[in-house]
Swiss-Prot record:
This is Small ribosomal subunit protein uS8c. Belongs to the universal ribosomal protein uS8 family. It comes from Nandina domestica. The lineage of its organism: Eukaryota, Viridiplantae, Streptophyta, Embryophyta, Tracheophyta. One of the primary rRNA binding proteins, it binds directly to 16S rRNA central domain where it helps coordinate assembly of the platform of the 30S subunit. Its main location: plastid.
Length: 132
């Protein structure tokens, strides 16, 4: 795990998805917990539980699977703003992913939220990642 916890989440989920694993283990921080709750609420993952191991907390999340096929859904996650190049947007210029089918996760002054929530509240922020 590196210093960019958001990139670590995205990489862990993407690698587990490509490797057809059912669960992902992610180091638990406030940012990772909030992003995983958004993914759970939006239906990209099925289940999340907090696991403690040697005085460290981990989030164990179950990836969403198709009903008739054994493999997980192909979830595409893309990191946008990174430590070397921050990308900011006001609420009017937040991009729509696949015409509203995907989501944009933003870090705003009121916390981490999706693009729909930011548009409703009329606030912009740092674009963390795209998910579709």
């Amino acid at each position: 795990m590196g210093r960019d916890t958001i990139a670590d989440i995205i990489t862990s989920i993407r690698n587990a998805d490509m490797d057809k694993k059912g669960t992902v283990r992610i180091a638990s921080t406030n940012i990772t917990e909030t992003i995983v709750k958004i993914l759970l609420r939006e239906g990209f993952i099925e289940n999340v539980r907090k696991h403690r191991e040697n005085d460290q907390f981990f989030l164990v999340s179950t990836l969403r699977h198709r009903r008739n096929r054994k493999g997980p859904y192909r979830t595409i996650l893309k990191r946008i703003s990174r430590p070397g190049l921050r990308i900011y947007s006001n609420y009017q210029r937040i991009p729509r992913i696949l015409g509203g089918m995907g989501i944009v996760i933003l870090s705003t002054s009121r916390g981490i939220m999706t693009d729909r929530e930011a548009r409703l509240e009329g606030i912009g922020g740092e674009i963390l990642c795209y998910i579709w």
